[in-house]
Amino acid sequence: MVMLLNKSGDFFGRLYINKMIYKMGIDIGSTTVKIVILDENDEIIYKCYDRHLSQVRAKTAELIELAENIIGDNEIKITVTGSAGQGVAQTCGFEFVQEVFVTGEMVKKYYPETDCVIELGGEDAKIIFFNGGLEERMNGSCAGGTGAFIDQMSLLLDVSNEELDKLSLKAEKIHTIASRCGVFAKSDIQPLLNQGAKKENIAASIFQAVVDQTITGLAQGRDITGNILFLGGPLYFFEGLRKRFTETLKLSELPPSLSDTPLEEGGYAIFPEIAPYAVALGAAISADSSNFLYKYDDIAALLNKSVSMSGNIRHGEPLFKNEEEYNEFKTRHSKEKAGETDIDTYGGGAYLGIDCGSTTTKIVMISEDYKILYNYYAANAGNPVDIVLAQLKRVRELCAGKITIKSAAVTGYGEELIRNAFSIDFGIVETIAHFKAAKYFNPNVNFILDIGGQDIKCFKIKNNAIDNIMLNEACSSGCGSFIESFAKSMGYTVEEFCKAGIYAENPVDLGSRCTVFMNSSVKQAQKEGASIGDISAGLSMSVVKNALYKVIRIHDASELGENIVVQGGTFLNDAILRAFEKAIEREVIRPNISGLMGAFGCAVYAREKSTTQNLQESAILSADELNAFSHSSQTTNCGLCANKCSITVNKFSNNKRFISGNKCERPLGIRENEKIPNMYHFKLDYIKSVINSGQKYPGRKTVGMPLGLNTYEMLPFWHSLWSNIGINIQVSDISSRELYQIGQHSIPSDTICYPAKLMHGHIENLIGKNITDIFYPCMTYNFDEKISDNHYNCPVVAYYPELLQSNMSGLQNINFMMPYFDVSNKRAFTKKFTQFFNEQVAAGRFDAIHMKTVKTAIDKAYKSQDLYFEVMLAEGERAVKFAGENNSRLIVLCGRPYHIDPEINHGIDKMLNSFGCVIITEDAASAMIKSKPKTKVLNQWTYHARLYNSAEFVSKRENAEFVQLVSFGCGIDAITTDEAREILEKNSKLYTQIKIDEINNLGAAKIRVRSMLAVSGEK
């Protein structure tokens, strides 16, 4: 035996040769510590699994201490692994082995027939393929689709993880929910809750989101086939998750008793009992090759020493220098108070405001002189209807006999549900409600910042009206739920967590990034010894930075103005309020009812409407009606058109009902106003007519074309070309969720835009139609419309066929034609296409035809495309004329040609139509301007040049508004949005952006559109 010492003379191990000893594997993940100890016969004699709540070293020491009696006086070898294990290994001198290697060791020893391992941890996820050599794919900094994601979803539904699992097993329907990170998923789940969707269905949908994230985000286009071994805590503890994986991957689940037996055939799902400890077991197996041995006392000493060590992390200034400064701060902000009146002594008229927000429900009732009689603030607990019902009963009880509720208004995500359920008199969009509340406290307010549970709303006020609105997109990092999630993950209440940051001496500089990126920063800070207070203060600063630099995008604090009102429940946190004031270097107003401002604004609005409409009593349900109130919901599919949209039917007392999830008015029994022009609908009908046009050639070759990206607008061109050559053309079906799902297994990256993801489904759709020849050209250039410095297509639109060919195994036996064409030069295109066609003839794929026929077909193709542009311009001009003659709002709904696809736009055009708006598209608006605007950016993309021209078009018309659809993952739109915004704002026009992806819930989009219409209507 040789004792090993470092340069300082400290002991860090013993060196033994060929001695039988115990082996310990320590797997320290992002949220848990797992330890397995093997005896000399490789039998498990100790295993443990526990959450470390970011106290990594202390928890590891604690769990090993529990094994003291088992280890006894035996020597032991140690291997550490896991995403958070390297720091422990380094400070203690233990051997560290990468977790993929140790997992492979475990698989080879216990499950050699395994083709693929799927392991989900707390914040880590990975797939290991064993066929064709070892290949591993891990998540990056995003914790979507992991245990942490499931924890966040349980918190949102206000159920335990065990209850979430049980709920999922009773599901009848799967909703589409994002899983790339928790804050996106919250944006999808909360509207479902507010619309009355069943928790059982939502629970199963959460697990399905994890499955989808694994397939698209981790597998990255590689097929998951054969015998699949599922490891990690989430897959062990959640039966519902195992069920979703098994069904989606079409596997046969092995009974637990067979999980340890050799498998002769593939296609099995293996869920071993050792799943939570599997990586630690692999580490213990790997420890056999180590030459370093330890006694229990050695291990305990090294771990205890590492607990007290800290590293180098960046710090910011303290929020408060001392308690005196904090007391001055509290005194100043305590002055901004709403008046109150004792409801027990008050008699007369009252006005009720309800704010059914994304995560909380707020209620305020005011007197005739705007004093608060009653208020309520609490979490939705996943069921806003029950909460509002209980509170309305309480309000009716307090008012009985002496107070008359003259009027009531509601706002927030649950506005329509609550209004229909309880006969609330008025609905008001959130932005206007918050503006009215802020004006009450400061009539001269020129900037309002509201940070709620999932929303950041910023309003610039000019001439006593909202001049500009800025909202966060689907990501809610930096909002109240952002802080709440961190607090809960560390074992603190929100109040305890925030209070800890007030007196923090060394706030950690965590930057301003999304939640899942921030998780890594927090873990690193804790690993380096940062206190909870330091992290709390650092997160408060991050919330502020996110609002200032990601949502508002300020360059200088002076842009915010002098009279700033902050509100929203998040600003009740003194640490965040202080961080905001320090960041902008000025004092702001935070009303004492900061978290109730939406409800207070509703009450003010209700009072205004009562006066203007001379209302003497609200139509809100009476006490008797509230006592008899009942509510049930059922999810179904609307059968009134081919889309078969998923809708939720809420049924209330007295045979009343409310339908949510609908994208048009048909389920409500209202016939759509077909007279209002909608160019999205017009374009789609035109494309459908093209698909059904042209001569059919029985017995001749059929060429397939996927309907998406660059083929959408160019379908008239290609359809005409192939038809006139004498070849049948088969276009893939119009996009649908089902079409997306049949191709999702080959999508190489979850960050690509949804229109590109759909192309995988379109190819599979054509293959399913037994098409053996598919034509999908690469196109660097678009038609030259003479509106930009060049006429490029974006790289995804131009070259996606290359990716499909490389990534889709189904194309191996298909003649997949992806030539490079430039349609902007007719002569060059004619030469290139005839060359391409002759090559296909020479290969025996097409029959030979006279080249004159080909050239004639090309001439007709260009004429067909010209006709398409002429028809679209004429329809745009008709729509503009209609809007003017009927005093209608004209919306230029800007995007890409493929945004007319209903699966991509999710019916946003119909939603705008339902508000009485006339819809035209960016190509028509662009063609109607006489001179193009000057841009600061290089204007070289055809589709994007249309956006700039459309912004100029809107700027010159009083009745026109600009709404831009942006697909998540579109890098170029990061530039176009800023440029379009600048063109509009310098002409005092609003810029409205709606981000869209595979999620089809329009709750947030509706709020944004209503805000835009309300504000532009007041100007």
For the regions a protein language model found, what residue spans apply to each?
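An N-terminal assembly and electron-transfer interface module characteristic of large anaerobic redox
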Residues: 15-16, 139, 143-149, 388, ...
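Short glycine-rich, Thr/Ser-proximal phosphate-binding strand/loop in the N-terminal lobe
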Residues: 23-65, 135-136, 140, 354-394, ...
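Glycine-rich phosphate-binding loop plus the immediately following alpha-helix
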Residues: 55-56, 132-173, 186, 276-279, ...
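Glycine-rich phosphate-binding loops at beta-strand->alpha-helix junctions
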Residues: 84, 219-252, 272-276, 411-414, ...
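Conserved phosphate-binding/catalytic loops in two-lobed NTP-binding clefts
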Residues: 97-100, 246-281, 425-431, 581-600, ...
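Glycine-rich phosphate-binding/hydrolytic loop that grips phosphoryl groups
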Residues: 147-152, 259-262, 266-308, 436, ...
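Adenine-nucleotide phosphate-binding core of ATP-dependent small-molecule kinases
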Residues: 185-216, 520-549
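Acidic, glycine/GT-rich loop-and beta-edge segments that sit at the periphery of enzyme/chaperone cores
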Residues: 286-349, 457, 608-675
